[in-house]
Amino acid sequence: MTVMEQRGAYRPTPPPAWQPRTDPAPLLPDAEPYRVLGTEAAAKADPELLRRLYAELVKGRRYNAQATALTKQGRLAVYPSSTGQEACEVAAALVLEERDWLFPSYRDTLAVVARGVDPVEALTLLRGDWHTGYDPHEHRVAPLSTPLATQLPHAVGLAHAARLKGDDVVALAMVGDGGTSEGDFHEALNFAAVWQAPVVFLVQNNGFAISVPLAKQTAAPSLAHKAVGYGMPGRLVDGNDAAAVHEVLADAVRRARAGGGPTLVEAITYRVDAHTNADDATRYRGDAEVEAWREHDPIALLERELTGRGLLDEAGAETARQDAETMAADLRARMNQDAELDPMDLFTHVYAEPTPQLLEQREQLRAELAAEAESEGARP
């Protein structure tokens, strides 16, 4: 017995029995991705919603194709196509109320357009301008995020602040499977779960972080399983089934709005095109893999359901295609009319009074551009 024990100042007590803070069982995702199209659940889907999803999918596919063509014409610096992932893009945009916020990643231009942003404005950043091109507050769409996962803490912060103010607002944050390897992903999910922020995280698992397959990114059974460690439910859904993605996201949005806290949704999908126009996808995947996923195309899946239920005929499908073509023609014409960008604008809106370092950088860029122009002029 120690001196302190003899004096009665120390009374050791057995530790309390350990109890989990949260029962993990209800948080676990299903073993298989949830599906609606081609199942009995399809009969319960709202016909008008299915038609709207179809029209937006067709428009989105054409938008991806036109934007990719604009890169080849030099009108866009880069375009990360979402061809094959349109179901996730459209469902994420349509599931939100007008008062809610969407936080997109760099590949989510289609979701931005489906949310109501002008198609030309949505491409402003990707054509090399210094700003995102649209007013985030007008459309409740955060600026496109080029750095991986940085939009996730922003979404959580906005959602948490809205709840503190008593605003009925839900934030939906989009990210790819590669973004789940970033520190911002952990910080966002941890904060959201601890403070029960009204936010939904949509992970579009398209199989690759540029060229890195999912098996080299995580050893978890699925990305949705990561939710359990944070104390939030994880949902697994077929990301090419637009009706299923919309239903799962709608459930998560309702839960968040009712004070139930965040949800992590993993949508299993596939990036049919290359990572960007600067990527050679044949170096890390084969044609057979791509063609196999084309058989599970989101537009074909929904079209088959609609025609089978008598909700879509050839005239309706042609109307959707014509509307998409009209949008593409307008996008093409307006992008070709855009004035050339002034690189010096990059330095204009950083500080009210430019710092010496900023002025130095501006002059350095000006000199480099002048030297480049002189070199071009000297060529025979």
Give the label of every model feature segment.
Residues 120, 243-246, 344:
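Residues in well-ordered alpha-helical elements
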Residues 25-27, 92-95, 255-256:
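A general structural signal for short secondary-structure junctions and capping/turn motifs
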Residues 62-65, 69-195, 213-219, 224, ...:
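Cofactor-binding active-site loop characterized by glycine-rich and histidine/acidic residues
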Residues 41-42, 109, 206-209:
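A short, flexible beta-alpha/helix-coil linker loop
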